[in-house]
Amino acid sequence: MPRIGLIVNDGKPLAVQTADTIQQRLELAGHAVVRASSSGGMVGFANPDQHLRLLGYSACVPEGFNNSMALAIVLGGDGTVLSAARQTAPVGVPILTINTGHLGFLAEAYLGDLDRALEVVLTEQWTIEERSNLVVSVMRGDQRRWEALSLNEMALHREPLTSMCHFEIAIGRHAPVDIAADGVILSTPTGSTAYALSAGGPVISPDCPVLQLTPIAPHSLASRALVFSDREPVTVFPATPERLMMVVDGSAGCYVWPEDRVLIRRSEHPVRFVRLVDHEFFQVLRNKLGWGLPHIAKPDKG
């Protein structure tokens, strides 16, 4: 029988306990289980005094994970899902996300659905939804100094107690544009409901083949979010004398210096989500973000 992976946020006792239960049930059904910690996908932040992450993004793949696996079950919150995406996308392993955290916007199932989810897994009745993924690379000349995959977004912004920044941004073959702001966000459709949404960007349906550029606290009224084809690679040149902070999906990043440039392109390795039922994106927006709910009736003026 095909092997099944388990990716667990081992910092959460509930996730570990649930993983033990799932592993026992899968092994009783005859499946070999390969277990890994989600910490392997949390690249972390590279400090100036540390060596930057010179390895490619495939270095996050756990030992024993490859494209012969049927799927990997992910236990944790949305942060765990973002880490698991880095661990599985390079080898094409689909992920079934079971939430043991808070909001669970990226979760396919909750603990109350566990029995039904395992039944679907054992009978192989799931479907696959692919989500676009980014490769984020920091370059200095011809040298790659840092690289990671990103399911949500890359945010490049100033440090505290520093001035407003300028960014020269080239999209594809087009001439660079200058943006004056506290920072910029480059996001996928999946990431449009995350940091980019808080910065004033639009919500984008995940089946749209686009990327989104959103300024953070822009200086100009003309600086607004831009949506464009994801076939276009993006290069961000820091046009400011101070170092900047780059954060990818909230759990990875490094400092970017004036002599560096950030390259962002769509990855050839999408994140493959296991769907137990038909996935209706607008219903997810309604249930988890309150989109489109009726306004609360105003109180009567007595």
Curated annotation (Swiss-Prot):
SUPFAM superfamilies: NAD kinase/diacylglycerol kinase-like. Its cofactor is a divalent metal cation. The keyword 4Fe-4S does not apply. The keyword NADP applies. Belongs to the NAD kinase family. One of its GO terms (biological process) is NADP biosynthetic process. It comes from the Bacteria. Its main location: cytoplasm. It is found in: Cytoplasm. Its EC number is 2.7.1.23. One of its GO terms (cellular component) is cytoplasm. It comes from Parasynechococcus marenigrum (strain WH8102). This is NAD kinase 2. The active site is at D78 (proton acceptor).
